């Protein structure tokens, strides 16, 4: 091991202070309170990048309203498999939050708010699709009570802002799921990391991991630099999680693990319009997703959301895609070119050839003017006034590109866990569905990276997630039990008391 002015040691180092690192840290603090733990965050606060509610494309979503998760098959039937899988994952996350509140790990449950989720379409063919979607989802316990709303008066009762001056001569419909949520993942991350620090963890803010080297004993030595003073030190860790958002790919590449070979990243930015006028926020009490535009990536479907940021209600509309070679909102313009390696060049070029529709979509988005953006907003809220809305720049999403024998490379919009074969290091790539499924993703990390301990941890994990290992959509009685428990503990009864059983 090289020597510098200072060397520290930790059982676990978590790179990044967002929701992924916060979740794994909280799980490990509960499972192994005797382990030493260090968070290393390049910015000066928790959740200042992708986990911030202003940088997160969707907050609290669980496949209730996102139409790209329920594609139509060639025969006209609806494939709900992905929606069910994501909702199953969200239920795992929701149970852990309830456990954390019940056991004092989370002292303020205001990070999650009950808000209906809705899908919104226009045109006869789209309405028919939404009808079949509702018919396909409703029998599943996880989607019980999802409604199809075609009546204009009922539409106006549910969504006054969207109904005002709308021409209902065109067929218009909603799928409405009253048991949705809004989640401030920034507030949640701060509480989870606070719990870890109270238990003895160290949190280094304004510090960046510049390199990491595997030692002969299987541990990792990280070179960490204080971004304010320039001081450097080494930290030796038995396990490393690279939960650094867009910075994960470069760090995994520096680690040299074979499992990271062939992966590349394609950054997609986002911008939103937002408004805090109380008249508007009172007139739109839901998250409403439209149908994805042709060529748009999954995270590109336009939606008009009510969000709570630090307890304050906002309306947020977008995203409008942006592009930058940066892998982080606060990153560098050299991030993309510096990530290119001989082993991922073919994958990058393959995507460049096969994703022409996506490229055309991005070019079109970059050419949007302020009037264009307001015109798109008025498709959701016809009476929108320019002066009520301001444009805000969201975070970067580095979508995964993986090697493909036939096409060279494919663009993957899911979250991918990359772990070394010996379990000493793991990293998170990709962006969707992301934060809402943080707990099952981290449980996967625990199982893959701590295989020798996982079996002994199972009793404690099943206390945290009572349905662990069970497919809830196949066990409606258990689902109702854990759902009702979580609803009560998280204080989500407000809109849930009339949820159909």
UniProtKB/Swiss-Prot annotation:
Pathway: Carbohydrate metabolism; tricarboxylic acid cycle; oxaloacetate from (S)-malate (quinone route): step 1/1. One of its GO terms (biological process) is tricarboxylic acid cycle. It comes from the Bacteria. SUPFAM superfamilies: FAD/NAD(P)-binding domain. Its EC number is 1.1.5.4. GO terms for molecular function: 2-hydroxyglutarate dehydrogenase activity; L-malate dehydrogenase (quinone) activity. Keywords: FAD, Flavoprotein, Oxidoreductase, Tricarboxylic acid cycle. It catalyses: (S)-malate + a quinone = a quinol + oxaloacetate. Its cofactor is FAD. Pfam families: Mqo. InterPro entries: FAD/NAD-bd_sf, MQO. Coiled coil: none annotated. HAMAP family: MQO. Belongs to the MQO family. This is Probable malate:quinone oxidoreductase. It comes from Mycolicibacterium paratuberculosis (strain ATCC BAA-968 / K-10). The lineage of its organism: Bacteria, Bacillati, Actinomycetota, Actinomycetes, Mycobacteriales.
């Amino acid at each position: 091991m090289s020597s510098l002015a200072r060397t520290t040691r930790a059982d676990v180092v978590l790179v990044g202070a967002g929701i992924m690192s916060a979740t794994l840290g909280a799980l490990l603090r509960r499972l192994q309170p005797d382990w030493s733990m260090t968070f290393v965050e390049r910015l000066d606060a928790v959740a200042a990048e992708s986990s911030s509610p202003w940088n997160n494309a969707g907050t609290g979503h669980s496949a209730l309203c996102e139409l790209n998760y329920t594609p139509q098959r060639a025969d006209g039937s609806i494939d709900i498999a992905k929606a069910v899988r994501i909702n199953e994952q969200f239920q795992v996350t929701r149970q852990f939050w309830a456990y954390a509140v019940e056991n004092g790990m989370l002292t303020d449950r205001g990070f999650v708010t009950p808000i209906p989720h809705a899908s919104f379409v226009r045109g006869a063919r789209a309405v028919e699709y939404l009808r079949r979607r509702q018919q396909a989802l409703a029998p599943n316990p996880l989607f019980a009570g999802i409604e199809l709303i075609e009546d204009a008066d009922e539409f106006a009762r549910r969504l006054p802002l969207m109904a005002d001056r709308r021409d209902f001569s065109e067929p218009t419909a909603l799928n409405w799921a009253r048991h949705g949520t809004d989640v401030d993942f920034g507030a949640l991350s701060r509480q989870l990391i606070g719990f870890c620090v109270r238990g003895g963890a160290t949190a280094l803010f304004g510090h960046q991991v510049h390199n990491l080297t595997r030692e002969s004993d299987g541990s990792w030595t990280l070179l960490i630099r204080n971004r304010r003073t320039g001081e450097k030190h080494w930290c030796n860790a038995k396990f490393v999680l690279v939960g650094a958002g867009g910075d994960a790919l470069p760090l995994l590449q520096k680690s040299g693990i074979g499992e990271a070979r062939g992966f590349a990243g394609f950054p997609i930015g986002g911008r939103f319009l937002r408004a805090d006028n109380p008249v508007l926020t009172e007139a739109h009490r839901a998250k409403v997703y439209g149908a994805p535009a042709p060529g748009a990536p999954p995270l590109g479907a336009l939606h008009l959301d009510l969000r709570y940021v630090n307890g304050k209600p906002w309306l947020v509309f977008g995203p409008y895609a942006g592009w930058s070679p940066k892998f982080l909102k606060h990153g560098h313009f050299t991030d993309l070119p510096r990530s290119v390696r001989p082993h991922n060049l073919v994958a990058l070029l393959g995507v460049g050839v096969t994703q022409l529709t996506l490229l055309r979509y991005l070019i079109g988005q970059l050419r949007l003017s302020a009037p264009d953006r307001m015109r798109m907003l008025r498709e959701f809220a016809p009476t929108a006034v320019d002066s009520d809305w301001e444009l805000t720049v969201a975070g970067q999403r580095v979508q995964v590109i993986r090697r493909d024998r036939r096409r060279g490379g494919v663009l993957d919009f899911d979250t991918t866990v990359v772990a070394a074969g010996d379990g000493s290091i793991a990293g998170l790539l990709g962006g969707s569905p992301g934060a809402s499924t943080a707990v099952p993703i981290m449980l996967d990390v625990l199982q893959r990276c701590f295989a020798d301990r996982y079996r002994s941890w199972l009793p404690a994990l099943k206390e945290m997630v009572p349905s662990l290992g069970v497919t809830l959509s196949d066990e409606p009685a258990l689902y109702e039990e854990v759902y009702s428990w979580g609803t009560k503990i998280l204080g989500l009864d407000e809109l849930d008391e009339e949820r159909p059983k």
